[in-house]
Amino acid sequence: MPHSDELDAGNVLAVENLNIAFMQDQQKIAAVRNLSFSLQRGETLAIVGESGSGKSVTALALMRLLEQAGGLVQCDKMLLRRRSRDVIELSEQSAAQMRHVRGADMAMIFQEPMTSLNPVFTVGEQIAESIRLHQNASREEAMVEAKRMLDQVRIPEAQTILSRYSHQLSGGMRQRVMIAMALSCRPAVLIADEPTTALDVTIQAQILQLIKVLQKEMSMGVIFITHDMGVVAEIADRVLVIYQGEAVETGTVEQIFHAPQHPYTRALLAAVPQLGAMKGLDYPRRFPLISLEHPAKQEPPIEQKTVVDGEPVLRVRNLVTRFPLRSGLLNRVTREVHAVEKVSFDLWPGETLSLVGESGSGKSTTGRALLRLVESQGGEIIFNGQRIDTLSPGKLQALRRDIQFIFQDPYASLDPRQTIGDSIIEPLRVHGLLPGKDAAARVAWLLERVGLLPEHAWRYPHEFSGGQRQRICIARALALNPKVIIADEAVSALDVSIRGQIINLLLDLQRDFGIAYLFISHDMAVVERISHRVAVMYLGQIVEIGSRCAVFENPQHPYTRKLLAAVPVAEPSRQRPQRVLLSDDLPSNIHLRGEEVAAVSLQCVGPGHYVAQPQSEYAFMRR
């Protein structure tokens, strides 16, 4: 049945009175209530709200992906204008018809790329599949287009990446592959669910610009779901604020940022960390927590002086980690990914050392190598005077009680067959630390400390939002009272209010128990708030390391300055053409087997502040 008369000429999408619910214990639990909005051709609508507010399930309902997950969707109207200009009612489409709509007319970039990419197919095959299905292209034509899309999202060595699998890529690389896949068929509507959450600030800036360029070329409507108000200020035309499944405020981006009316909107904006807010301060500070009832009332931030003098709890010297790449008829190793090259640093009890850098710079690999989750080819890792890199498997397991890891992708690191209570109890059982009754009480306490309810222990991972799942992973890491926590993008999936609570929790635990954090992140505003020291990594090497004050207030290396310049600012009226971005000609850390790359030489430029010498800045700094 034609619906052209029901959709305004300029609109590509219109939704009226959307209601979403889930059945739990034979009760209907409402997730979204009476939500209405429209999207114009070439417009970007940002949907913002806390984790669990209903943002992602709204997107899944539009894609008709909720029914198979047990969602109950009711809507008075859900109209889409296809690329052919035909208007269809999405709720009336059969499963077969929706397969032709998804990808071609409406595409989605999902929040967790590791679980969205098929692990048994190469990256090239997955991108080409959509192109072949919707554009009637041959396999060869589809692969050429797939490479072009990878080039557009600035993946270096795109031809090589086509033949690799998702587990061989970093989190940011996987997210860029997802973006390339979604944009490959030039849809009429693009739904982006936290598309830049896993990306560092420089690549995030490139992706936001890329989406805007393609949007202008194709007059594509974009629904941008995010908790990053800096990104909202940069990309949105209109903003829809959702609180507990209901729309509480909508307006242009200027209206929302400059004259917010609802207390929840004001609270969201007040909770946004601002880069530069720590200028002149020596120690980490708690985030001010803003309540909905009193958005202007702030908890006084307390400086955290926690570093213990003496011997480092963790010492890393000349760490080298490489991954083999096979090719040829005999499948021999011909090249290697130089993921980490001669990295050295110390970590003291009660200290937070942040590793920052682009996706693929070696941050996550460094963290994993410290626990021997990936094997290194050289260097020393010393924990409390004991070399980790030479331990037997039995002794290594005992040591892992004192070093815990919070992984980047929360859904992939939780067992879907276990309740979250069992997942949190598991490390306690493995190490035989607490009897069952005490363990259950410990789980309840941990869940409350990370902002969840004790009764959530009986639920499964798929019943939680991405941010809630990350809080579960943090609770599990804290269960054993470790001496060191390696946090790999631990708060990147959290909205601003919960992020502040989690950072404050980490700071409190650091103050109470002297925990040392290796904090891996691309969020420079959060890094500035939580760090004692900062190390900047590029192509597997540290190019600048020093105190937070030194690195943020007096950055010496060109790459550090570029990272800071790329941070989005929560001010829509600010013009950003002057922002410095990396060259499109990204260098590669893939080299022929046996080829050695010169290690950078760090020069002291201030107390505890070391920077790569100019002559050591080899091809990775394209000026």
From Swiss-Prot:
The reply to whether Transferase figures as a keyword in the UniProt entry is no
Task: Return the broad EC class.
Answer: translocase
Provide the ABC transporter domain boundaries. 15-269, 314-564
Q: Which reaction does it catalyse?
A: glutathione(out) + ATP + H2O = glutathione(in) + ADP + phosphate + H(+)
Q: Which InterPro entries match?
A: AAA+_ATPase (IPR003593), ABC_transp_ATP-bind (IPR050319), ABC_transporter-like_ATP-bd (IPR003439), ABC_transporter-like_CS (IPR017871), Oligopep_ABC_C (IPR013563), P-loop_NTPase (IPR027417)
Q: What is its EC number?
A: 7.4.2.10
Task: Extract the GO molecular function terms from the UniProt entry.
Answer: ATP binding; ATP hydrolysis activity
Task: Fetch the CDD domains from UniProt.
Answer: ABC_NikE_OppD_transporters (cd03257)
Q: How does it sit in the membrane?
A: Peripheral membrane protein
Keywords in alphabetical order, please: ATP-binding, Cell inner membrane, Cell membrane, Hydrolase, Membrane, Nucleotide-binding, Repeat, Translocase, Transport
Q: Where in the cell is it found?
A: Cell inner membrane
The GO biological-process annotations, alphabetized, read as: peptide transport; transmembrane transport
GO CC terms, sorted: plasma membrane
Pfam family membership, one: ABC_tran
- Key word Chloroplast present: no
Q: Which PANTHER family match?
A: GLUTATHIONE IMPORT ATP-BINDING PROTEIN GSIA, TRANSPORT ATP-BINDING PROTEIN
User: NCBIfam families in the record, alphabetically?
Assistant: PRK10261.1 (NF007613), PRK10419.1 (NF007739), PRK11308.1 (NF008453)
Function field: Part of the ABC transporter complex GsiABCD involved in glutathione import. Responsible for energy coupling to the transport system.
Q: How does it assemble?
A: The complex is composed of two ATP-binding proteins (GsiA), two transmembrane proteins (GsiC and GsiD) and a solute-binding protein (GsiB).
Q: Which family does it belong to?
A: Belongs to the ABC transporter superfamily. Glutathione importer (TC 3.A.1.5.11) family.
Name of this chain's protein: Glutathione import ATP-binding protein GsiA
> Which organism is this protein's natural source?
Shigella flexneri serotype 5b (strain 8401)
The top of its lineage is: Bacteria, Pseudomonadati, Pseudomonadota, Gammaproteobacteria, Enterobacterales
